[in-house]
Amino acid sequence: MAQQRRGGFKRRKKVDYIAANKIEYVDYKDTELLSRFVSERGKILPRRVTGTSAKNQRKVTTAIKRARVMALMPYVNED
């Protein structure tokens, strides 16, 4: 039988940053906003990490890819 965990902690619900701040258009030129959704290695973070909705994640992904093509953001950060 499965044992119930005691003294566990509640996970905090992740909030969609874009919806919370009422951002309607995710601009590829806004690298400060886009850098919130990119790891330190330069990879796009998944929804389960950032807490964004599916619709906003698609907007963020296309904006990051456009910024990379326009050389506003790096493809890979190697430190």
From Swiss-Prot:
InterPro entries named among the record's database cross-references: Ribosomal_bS18, Ribosomal_bS18_CS, Ribosomal_bS18_sf
Gene3D superfamilies: Ribosomal protein S18
Source organism superkingdom: Bacteria
UniProt record, GO biological process: translation
Keywords: Ribonucleoprotein, Ribosomal protein, RNA-binding, rRNA-binding
PROSITE patterns listed in its UniProt record: RIBOSOMAL_S18
GO cellular component entries: cytosolic small ribosomal subunit
UniProt entry tagged with the keyword RNA-binding: yes
Record-level Gene Ontology MF annotations: small ribosomal subunit rRNA binding; structural constituent of ribosome
Function: Binds as a heterodimer with protein bS6 to the central domain of the 16S rRNA, where it helps stabilize the platform of the 30S subunit.
HAMAP family associated with the record: Ribosomal_bS18
Similarity comment: family membership: Belongs to the bacterial ribosomal protein bS18 family.
Protein name as it appears in the record: Small ribosomal subunit protein bS18
Upper lineage: Bacteria, Bacillati, Bacillota, Bacilli, Lactobacillales
